[in-house]
Amino acid sequence: MSTSSVATSDNATLDFSKLVPFSNSSDFHPYCLISDYNNQTNVEQCWLGDQFLPLADLDTENPSIVSTMNNWIQGLVKSYGIDGLRIDTAKHVRKDFWPAFAKAAGVFTMGEVLIGDVGYAAPYTGVFQVMLCKL
């Protein structure tokens, strides 16, 4: 699962009203593609994808977004009896988002941080029970 982005075919014509429950452009970070993977703010607040298929990036600094995400994962886990989550693209969301999200889920969490730098990946070990990274 990825909690940070929503696929779109074209940023210029994106109709946010169709993206339920995040149906306002203010629910997302302003459009910018990630250009510097050494800049954590750029990684967390710019969009994944490319000019042909940009992935709108949720504003996970917004308390309303955080609350909605936490309620959503709690309900999803309960409804489907999920016993563990693999969270892809974890480095694209601020680290302090994840503890409350994992607590709301109430199940085993495995975070994916695709990077070959142990120093960069190490802080995520305190966030998730298991880490996947490229070494």
Residue ranges and their predicted role:
Residues 2-51:
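Core domains of carbohydrate- and sulfate-ester-processing enzymes
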Residues 5-17, 71-135:
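Active-site-proximal helices and loops of the catalytic beta/alpha 8
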Residues 20, 50, 56, 112, ...:
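Flexible, active-site-adjacent loop/turn segments at secondary-structure boundaries
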Residues 35-80, 90:
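Active-site-adjacent "subsite" loops/lids of carbohydrate-active enzymes
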